C-alpha cells in the first residue's frame, strides 16, 4: 500500500482527544484506529503487534540476520488529533497546486498572503481539507510513514536493518501521550518521534511548559444596588490578563521567544476560571515567567482581598535539549540520511512539545523529532504534500539501515 492510500485510510477515523476527559484514552474512538493499526502491523509481519487496554499500539520489526547486535531504534507517532478543530467526518482532497490562492472544496481557501511558503509546492500534489475540519496530518502522516517504511523493509529483506520498535500513542495532543507508555514493550534505548512539520525539519529543542489554572472569586450583588459592594469576577479576571505583557503572546512571538497564552475563560460575576499556558525554551526565563504570574496573583489578592485569586501552577514538560546533548549522533545521523536522499535538513526549535520530550526526561529514551512533511497543523488550512510523505518513507528506511 502506498503511503498516500494509507494516510487517507487513517484520517477516516475520528481520533480527536479531549482536554476534559479523565478516561484513558481520553476518547474511546482513538482505540478504533489503534485496533486497525495493530491488526495491520500484524498482517504485515511485525512481531508482538497489539494494542494494550489503554490504547497504546506496540510492535517490533526484528533485525535482519547478522544485524541483531546493532542497538534497536524506536519510531513513534501519535494517533489522536487536536481538539481545537473538528477531526470528525474528514473529507480530504488531493489537488495539484498550480500556484496562487487555493480554494478549498466547501469553504475558505489557502491564501498566499497568509501562507507565503505555499510557493514551494507549485506543481506538487497536496492533500488538503474541505475547509470544515482539520486534516489529521498531525500525526497520521507520521503513522502512515512509519507503517509504510516497515512494509518496505519486510518486502525487501535484502536491505539490512536493525531492530525497530514501533509505538503509536493516544492523547499526545492533550499532553498525556506518554502517561502510560510501557518501556517493557519497547526494546529501544533511543528513538525518533515522527511528528514535525515541513520536509527537512529536525527538532531537538522544545519549550519548557507550565499550565495555569486561575480561579477568581467575586461577590455578586444586584447591579441596581452594587455600588462599593460588587466584585465582578469577570472584570477581575480581565485585570489579570491586562497584567500579562501584550507583546509576549503566541501571535507576537517566534523562534526561541517564549510567551503567555490565555486559552480559556469561563464563568460569571461570582466566579471565573481562567486557563493559560506558559512557554519558553530557556529554563531561567521559564522560571521567571512563572514567578511573574505568581507575583501578579499576589498583587491582585492585595487589591481585591486575600483569597480572591487562587492559582494552580503546574509544570507540564521540559526542554529535551539537555537530554539530547549527550546523544547528538541521533541528530547527525538524521541530517546525513536526509542529505543522502536529497533533502536539506533544517534544525528548528519546536514551538510546542512532543511525546519525545517527555520520553527523553521521564524514561531516559533520547527522542528527537522528525518532520512528517505537513503544515498548518490544528486547523482547517492543514495540508501535506504527497511527495513529502513519500520522501519521509525513504528517510525512515535509510535511518534504520545498517
Regions found by a protein language model. Name each.
Residues 192-226, 233-234:
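Phosphate/diphosphate-binding glycine-rich loops and adjacent basic-rich segments that engage nucleotide
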Residues 67-163, 168, 391:
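Active-site metal-coordination/substrate-binding segment of hydrolases
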Residues 28, 133-144, 227-235, 383-390:
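Short, conserved micro-motifs enriched in small and acidic residues
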Residues 119-207, 247-263, 267, 274-281, ...:
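Acidic/histidine-rich catalytic neighborhood of metal-dependent amide-processing enzymes
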Residues 2-28, 128, 317, 375-379:
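N-terminal capping segment at the start of a domain
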Residues 22-70, 74-76, 80:
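A non-catalytic alpha/beta surface segment that caps or lines the substrate-entry region
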Residues 119-133, 215-221, 341, 374-377:
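Glycine/charged-rich beta-loop-alpha catalytic/anionic-binding loops adjacent to active sites
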Residues 233-402:
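Metal-dependent amide/peptide-bond hydrolase catalytic core
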